């Protein structure tokens, strides 16, 4: 049976100034603080809790590897842990515009990830039993993500 995608939620997160870590065996590492934000979807909505971060690195082939970890607080006060690992890459000229904080159409670059959730027992524990993918758009001070459940 062929799987389909079902919209889970749309998330907007405000980002802090990247903290350069430097060269590592993986590539050029930086930490991007996640300051907060909001999310909404057909089955859940709430806020992005400040305090998370994206421990990303840029490989030699100029692919950015995203390794984000953060919390979501639902409208009914349940905390959901998110781990999101993905890739962002595109033509050099497009990446330079993104780095400069310019507005770039997300269709000009590839930004995909595979989020996973850790939810407590209760109304959202179904998140622990599904696989998800997401697509994203990077902006100067924020990120916009669309999460999909693989059916």
Describe the function of each predicted region.
Residues 1-151:
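Beta-strand-enriched cores of mature, soluble protein domains
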């Amino acid at each position: 049976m062929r799987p389909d995608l079902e919209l889970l939620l749309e998330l907007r997160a405000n980002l802090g100034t990247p903290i350069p870590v430097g060269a590592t065996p993986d590539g050029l590492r930086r930490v991007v603080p996640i300051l907060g934000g909001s999310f909404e979807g057909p089955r859940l909505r709430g806020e992005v809790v400040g305090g998370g971060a994206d421990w990303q690195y840029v490989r030699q082939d100029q692919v950015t590897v995203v390794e984000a970890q953060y919390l979501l607080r639902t409208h009914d006060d349940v905390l959901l842990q998110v781990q999101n690992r993905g890739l962002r890459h595109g033509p050099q000229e497009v990446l330079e515009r993104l780095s400069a904080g310019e507005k770039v159409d997300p269709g000009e670059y590839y930004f995909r990830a595979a989020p996973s959730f850790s939810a407590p027992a209760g109304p959202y524990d179904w998140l622990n039993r599904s696989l998800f993918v997401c697509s994203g758009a990077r902006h100067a001070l924020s990120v916009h993500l669309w999460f999909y459940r693989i059916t």
